[in-house]
Design a protein with these regions (language model features):
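Basic, low-complexity segments
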Residues: 1-26
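Active-site-adjacent structural elements in folded domains
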Residues: 21-28, 70, 164-167, 203
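Arg/Lys-rich, glycine/proline-spaced intrinsically disordered segments
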Residues: 25-30, 245-248
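Short, positively charged, Gly/Tyr-enriched micro-motifs
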Residues: 30-96
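Generic structural "secondary-structure junction" signal
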Residues: 35, 49, 67-73, 114, ...
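Polybasic low-complexity intrinsically disordered regions
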Residues: 53, 57-60, 78-235, 242-244
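Short, charged, surface-exposed secondary-structure boundary motifs
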Residues: 203, 247-255
Length: 255
């Protein structure tokens, strides 16, 4: 269904421009992996919440994934490290925002964008735990992590200096938090904002309102966004907070 709805070739100009892919002057050597093919790998990975290793395994295991991506044989499936390197390169060259805008414009052209309300909620993205010294962790907490490991670039490229620890419901998380704006009717993602996991929901939310949202449109918000109402009202949309019950104070029928 997705491959019929979206022609992924529309992303090729952005991918080739950002990744600075030059035209091959000869057929010598191994051909580089097609950027649109790798972008489809990223799409499948994000859609199903797969790690790099899981993405490699699942694409090898599922014919439907290979058909969607355009991979003929299992031997042609990119390995986990190739997937990681491609994602890092997309991040480094700042391609994601342009790709998302292109995706949004394409959905609009298909008539899939309807301003009948949006939902904003946050979810954790877990990162591999870092093995740093106490002094290194203190430097990272001060926001000075970029000054570390400059004498060892290979080690530095494997270090995550932006992920943070947080607790929720008695569970501990290390990584990031995705704040997503979703169309209430189609459930398509209309916008996103990524922060470290330690940033509370109440510190984000209104930043996701943009010119594509209708005046007065209702925004349904998770209870974590209590206190952000003024920011939404200032942008001419209507916030509705999902109320939460507490011990001894359960929600009534009206709530």
């Amino acid at each position: 269904f997705i491959s019929k709805m979206i022609d992924f070739e529309i992303f090729r100009p952005i991918l080739e421009s950002k990744l600075q892919i030059a035209e091959r002057k000869s057929n010598a050597g191994r051909r580089p992996i097609d950027p649109v093919l790798m972008f489809k790998v990223m799409f499948v990975q994000r859609l199903y919440g797969l790690s790099d290793e899981q993405a490699e395994y699942q694409i090898k295991d599922r014919t439907s994934f290979r058909d969607f991506i355009g991979i003929c044989t299992v031997d042609d499936v990119p390995d986990a490290r190739t997937i990681w390197k491609y994602r890092e390169e997309l991040t480094r060259c700042g391609a994601y925002d342009e790709l998302f805008k292109q995706f949004y414009a394409h959905l609009q052209s298909l008539g899939l964008i309807v301003n009948e309300g949006k939902i904003i909620d946050a979810s954790f993205v877990v990162s591999p735990r870092q093995r740093n010294t106490r002094d290194e962790n203190q430097t990272i907490k001060k926001g000075e992590g970029d000054s570390l490991w400059n004498d060892n670039p290979h080690k530095k490229c494997h270090k995550d200096i932006d992920a943070r620890w947080t607790k929720k419901g008695g569970d501990t998380f290390y990584g990031y938090k995705n704040h997503a704006k979703v169309c209430r009717k189609t459930k398509l993602i209309m916008g996103y904002d990524t922060t470290s996991a330690s940033v509370h929901d109440s510190k984000r939310g209104a930043e996701l309102v943009d010119d594509n949202d209708a005046v007065g449109e209702i925004f349904w918000l998770d209870a974590g966004y209590v206190g952000t109402e003024e920011g939404f009202v200032s942008k001419s949309v209507t916030p509705v907070i999902c109320e939460k019950g507490f011990r001894g104070r359960p929600l009534n029928e009206e709530q």
